[in-house]
Curated annotation (Swiss-Prot):
Name of protein: Large ribosomal subunit protein bL20
GO cellular component: ribonucleoprotein complex; ribosome
Stored CDD domains: Ribosomal_L20
Keyword Endoplasmic reticulum: no
Family assignment from sequence similarity: Belongs to the bacterial ribosomal protein bL20 family.
Molecular function via GO: rRNA binding; structural constituent of ribosome
Entry superkingdom: Bacteria
Disulfide bonds listed in the record: none
Source species: Borrelia turicatae (strain 91E135)
Gene Ontology biological process: ribosomal large subunit assembly; translation
Keyword presence, Zinc-finger: no
Pfam families: Ribosomal_L20
Main function: Binds directly to 23S ribosomal RNA and is necessary for the in vitro assembly process of the 50S ribosomal subunit. It is not involved in the protein synthesizing functions of that subunit.
């Protein structure tokens, strides 16, 4: 029986890794061994940061809403408590955008909640 060297698959596998590491710096893009390790680590960071991004954006929205509310004499926790009681169904992302881009509408919402 003939010996199978598997050369085509071997080259294709290496090519696939090196193609994914195209924008990396130095030997991390051309040396297969380093490229493979760097790519694996990069994928780990990507997975971790997809989870972290959600937390970061939520924190950003809360900070923006809180900053807009301090000028109006109400704090964040009281605002959200009143928001839920008055049955206004706006999420933090929408409220954050309103606080930055359309301050008049945001003020109307705060006024509605205060009364």
């Amino acid at each position: 029986m003939a010996r199978v060297k598997n050369g085509i698959v071997h080259v294709a596998r290496r090519k696939k890794i090196l193609k994914k590491t195209k924008g990396f710096w130095g030997t991390k893009k051309s040396n297969y061994k380093k490229a493979k390790d760097t790519l694996r680590k990069g994928m780990m960071y990507a997975t971790r940061d997809r989870k972290t991004r959600k937390r970061d954006f939520r924190s950003l929205w809360i900070v923006r809403i809180s900053a807009a509310l301090t000028g109006m004499g109400i704090n964040y926790s009281k605002f959200f408590e009143s928001l839920k009681k008055s049955n206004i169904k706006l999420n933090r992302k929408i409220l954050s955008n309103l606080a930055i881009e359309d301050i008049e509408t945001f003020k109307k919402i705060v006024y509605e909640i205060k009364n």
